[in-house]
Amino acid sequence: MTLLNPYFGEFGGQFVPQILMPALRQLEEAFVNAQKDPEFQAEFTDLLKNYAGRPTALTLCQNLTAGTKTKLYLKREDLLHGGAHKTNQVLGQALLAKRMGKSEIIAETGAGQHGVATALACALLGLKCRVYMGAKDVERQSPNVFRMRLMGAEVIPVHSGSSTLKDACNEALRDWSGSYETAHYLLGTAAGPHPYPTIVREFQRMIGEETKAQILEKEGRLPDAVLACVGGGSNAIGMFADFIDDTSVRLIGIEPGGLGIESGQHGAPLKHGRLGIYFGMKSPMMQTSDGQIEESYSISAGLDFPSVGPQHAYLNSIGRADYVSITDDEALDAFKTLCRSEGIIPALESSHALAHALKMIKAEPEKEQLLVVNLSGRGDKDIFTVHDILKDRGEI
């Protein structure tokens, strides 16, 4: 029996080998108790404020929207220590690991941001850290690999399968099944077996809580829409969670359209996948005709994931949130636009959400609308990728 509901509608669950069930039970129990423990909450809040730098700013983009009637704000998770929203929930889970008496942390990472956040939390809290990363991602995210190693983490390249995030996830789970007595698997997104989707949402929900308080202070009303990119879905569920009951606020998640949905080279399982079981959960995923997990693709390593968190699947199924896709080229254009108009270099992941906001503004420039984009991370890690693409195009 679980203490919390392991499902969101029909999505979610705990599809793991029997050997891992005690570890998941222990984790759920520790989480439920920690949520009620004022000491744990005070320590977590203190780390978020004095180590990570919360609350993050809500920035009005005046140049981007000039000549339109839209007000566009960015929730600046890029300003968080570590460079992205990942730091929030990693600090929470690392504290939970210590509470459970674990001495080691296992993690998987795609863009490297979760790996960096895990490495910094482990350095801070005195935990051993090993990070599994697809060999392809090790190549395309070399600055983050070095940052992890600088902070004492062991980075393990994964050469199996497509050598990307899904393979790193598989290896991390395999490791944990043999080491869970001393190690905590610090999962990096709001997906996977219960209780991870719930834990990650709760340890990210301050994004939406702060946004709501800040926008009410600045504008005196709630936004018409909040937008966030969706890979596994942690930054998006962190933004959406506090707005779910505010039905006047549209929740818009942006999946990576890659080279175009029709090309098959994308990472948009919510709208273009089939229901299946993978990574310990039941959720939409990209599958071949015979039910094998298909490789996802995105210009941004952090969105390159073949499935999606179960709460997003549920919000999509009941029509509470809308999910759309943005191609590599559209994300790249938004990346350049923000750099040149506001002096902010966004992560390629976040650029997908920004691109859809810009589409909305362009479609109805005379419409008075108040939009908030979750700028989930900064783009320092992506400058080499963008440089190579722009060089090939002759733009630099």
Swiss-Prot record:
Gene3D superfamilies: 3.40.50.1100. Its EC number is 4.2.1.20. PROSITE patterns: TRP_SYNTHASE_BETA. NCBIfam families: trpB. Belongs to the TrpB family. The beta subunit is responsible for the synthesis of L-tryptophan from indole and L-serine. This is Tryptophan synthase beta chain. It comes from Pectobacterium carotovorum subsp. carotovorum (strain PC1). The gene is trpB.
